[in-house]
Every structure is written in C-alpha cells, then in structure tokens.
Amino acid sequence: GRSALKPEASQMVLKRWGFKRTNFVLANTIERLGPYKEQLSAENQEWQKKAYVPPDDAHNRYFEVDTALAYLDAFISQVREAYGKLELFGPEHCEPNSYESLDYEGRVLVLSPDTLKESCWTPQNQLWLAHDGFGCSPHAVGRSIRCTCLGDGEQTRWNRTDFTGVLKEEFLPGWAREKLEEFQGQNAGMGGMEMT
C-alpha cells in the first residue's frame, strides 16, 4: 500500500542527518522531479514550494533520493509530521511583512530555526524580546538587535535577518506572557516595554 514505509525509516534518517539536511535533500529531489512531482500529495508539493533550494544543477544532482514516488511521498509526509511535532514557530505565526515594514523595538520576535542549531529547536529558544539596536528599524543601515530570550533570559545581539518576524499576539504562549510581565515589572522605572 501507499503507506508501506515503516515509521522508523524517517526517524533513523533524521537521527543521523537532522532536519536541515534531510529537508534540503527532499526539497531538492522534488524540485528535480519536473512534471513527475504532480504525482506527490498536494501537501508535499506545497511544502516544497516553501523550501529554498539554491539553483546549482552542477551539484544539486548529487543530493537526490532515488526511489519510487510512493515511498518518497510517504517519507516526506513522515518527515513533515516529525517536524510538526516540534511545535516551532514559523512565518504563519508572524505579522505579515514584519521584516520589510515593522519596527521591532519592544516586540516579541521569532528566531528562525535556520539560525539555531537543531539541538536548540524549541519554542522557548525561538521567542526573543527586542530591546534596541539599528536592526529594530526596517530601513536602517545597521542590522543588529539587542534582545532577551524569553525562554532562559539570555541577552545577546542578533541580526534582523536572523528573525522570521514579529509574533502575532494570539500565538504568544502563557509562559512567554509571564516572562514579558516580569520584564515589564523590572523595567517600569525605564518606561516599560510593549507586550505587542
């Protein structure tokens, strides 16, 4: 049948190669299928459209999966399901056009999973409160943003390009809201910070 692929197939590959490499190879494979990609599920085709594969025919041909399309489709679905279980924040959780048009100062930002090591892929490591820096402005020459991780309180600087965008208020988890209130209390003498 269509789902004859054992569940542990993707688990073994992900354990050895990780999501970043596996996702690249799968997206590249779909890209190189040409018209045959229409035989994959609509969800897997849609997933591939969101993945970036650098145009490099000379080298990309070495990063393909050579298997029956039914197995490829089932494998991609397994990998997508495993990724979904991580419950990471993505563009769908962010304000539209954040990077191009929004000021980040005082806002909760979503750090892109591409910026983090896979061992740090948790929602707690993705949410950061932006304090200041030229990178807060979408039109500034500087890109640096001083911010605090809502998960563990670490303060550091990231570049504007490291973030997916500004988190929409409705996706702010309770634990993050508590941290923001904590920060607001600590900074009340300095004018406070916005929660949105």
Per-region residue spans from a language model:
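Gram-negative host-targeted secretion-system effectors, predominantly Type III and Type IV
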Residues: G1-T196
